[in-house]
A protein has these predicted regions:
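N-terminal export/assembly segments and adjacent metallocofactor-ligating motifs
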Residues: 1-196, 210, 214, 233, ...
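Flexible, glycine/charged-enriched surface loops at secondary-structure junctions
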Residues: 61-65, 199-204, 251, 282-289
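Conserved short loop/turn motifs at secondary-structure junctions
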Residues: 67-75, 228-232, 255-262, 294, ...
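Short, conserved loop/helix-junction motifs that constitute active-site signature segments
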Residues: 149-154, 278, 376-381, 398
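P-loop NTPase catalytic nucleotide-binding module
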Residues: 180, 184-250
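Long hydrophobic segments that form regular secondary structure
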Residues: 236, 244, 342-360, 364-368, ...
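A glycine-rich, hydrophobic/aromatic-adjacent loop/helix-cap motif
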Residues: 244-348
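Phosphate/diphosphate-binding loops
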Residues: 374-375, 380-394
Length: 401
């Protein structure tokens, strides 16, 4: 079957026709008129209007007076063209709504591995003998992924989650960690694994650095204190540590329960450290694997639809800049020389009058931004607000120009 869904259709997609999601929008673009009404125009006229407005704003206020907010919902080709237009033609700021769900994982990946990319495929769920979900509920949130789990005939499913979620109900083991207790639990697990010698010393020496400092760091995280802080008994934590030790192909999976949680980056790094110290990384059925919330959040980072260089690199890294410029066939001077504005900085820039034009793509910040009243006040200050979406009924579309 197809490598992503293996021929399985997600129940969410199959149910769309039974929900209030029928696209009733006209296939033509619309431009707001002086009286506030929206007028349909041809695609050629719509394209020309947006292009002229963007160029006029940049000529009047400067290159960074316009910005874009992207999504995690496009194809790779869509991300590639949007990234190229914003980065290499308009040479301005663009970030994605994927920051709201994946910034934690991005930072953890870069600090742990040196680059932003989890090293796994969905096939690993079928090959792992010990599958550990942390702050994830794939039964509901990722049905296709869960189907892979069910196809695995030889696995133990472990869930670490304060809630007895649908996934916890289908698991072999459920550990109801206290809210805000997951980081302490993970550090305690690391300490237990080290004390019992349940680590892969050869892998650690060959592929990691800083192990000695990490070993000293986790020593204060004890079983007795974990019972109070993490809400799990010493027996439960020892059982979990033994399950990790006995597994031959252990995989750790996390999503928004970690990424939008307390000390999220540290928690994600702690998960990665467990995989590294036990040698459960880089082999089929293993890994510390961040599950994205949107279908192509990785694509947004790969094609610079977020505030990073192409392929999730840093704008200040000379080696990465040279490789990206070569791959794109452009002069290196075309690439931005500093980190560009993030989602929150774009909203701040609008409210402060520095950004005059905004182009959003398949996202609805008027509804989903963390403090959407700040966005509501911001859009009223824009001279140009372009909303690109299949639905003209979303809240952001009601504010567009």
């Amino acid at each position: 079957g197809y490598p992503v869904n293996d021929g399985f259709c997600c129940i969410k997609g199959l149910s769309l026709d039974k929900q209030q999601t029928v696209v009733k929008t006209s296939p033509l673009p619309k431009i707001r008129q002086a009286d506030g009404s929206m007028k349909e125009v041809s695609w050629d006229e719509g394209f020309q209007y947006v292009a002229d407005q963007l160029q006029e704003l940049q000529a009047k206020y400067g290159r960074e007076s316009v910005a874009g907010i992207s999504t995690g919902q496009l194809t790779m080709e869509g991300f590639a063209i949007f990234g190229h237009v914003m980065r290499n033609y308009l040479k301005t700021n663009v970030d994605g709504n994927t920051r709201l769900c994946m910034a934690t994982a991005v930072v953890a990946h870069k600090q742990s591995y040196g680059f932003d990319a989890p090293g796994y495929t969905l096939k690993d769920l079928e090959l792992s003998d010990t599958i550990i979900f942390i702050g994830a509920n794939p039964v509901v949130a990722h049905p296709i992924l869960w189907k892979r789990v069910r196809q695995n005939p030889d696995k133990k499913v472990i869930v670490i989650d304060p809630r007895k979620s649908e996934t916890a109900m289908n698991a072999d083991y459920w550990y109801p960690v206290k809210c805000r207790g997951d980081l302490y639990l993970l550090y305690t697990l690391a300490n237990v694994l080290i004390e019992k010698g349940w680590i892969d010393q050869n892998y650690i020496e060959a592929h990691t650095e800083g192990y000695g400092e990490f070993k000293e760091f986790v020593k204060p995280f004890t079983l007795d204190q974990a019972q109070e802080t993490a809400g799990l008994s010493p027996e439960q934590i020892l059982e979990l540590a033994q399950l990790i030790h006995e597994g031959k192909r252990v995989s750790f999976w996390w999503t928004m329960g970690v990424n939008q949680g307390y000390e999220a980056v540290r928690t994600a790094q702690a998960i990665i450290n467990l995989a590294l110290m036990t040698g459960n990384i880089g082999r089929p059925g293993t890994g510390a694997n961040s599950i994205t919330g949107q279908c192509n959040a990785m694509g947004s980072r790969s094609y610079s639809n977020t505030a990073v260089l192409y392929a999730g690199g840093d704008f200040t890294n000379p080696a990465r800049r040279a490789k990206v410029a070569e791959a794109l066939g452009v002069d290196e001077s075309v690439l931005a020389e500093k980190p560009t504005a993030t989602y929150n900085q774009i909203i701040e820039g609008i409210n402060e009058g520095r950004i005059k034009g905004l182009w959003i793509l398949c996202t609805n910040p008027r509804h989903s931004w963390t403090n959407n009243e700040t966005f509501a006040s911001a859009v009223k200050k824009l001279e140009l607000f372009v909303v690109q979406d299949i639905y003209d009924t979303i809240e952001s579309a009601e504010e567009c120009t």
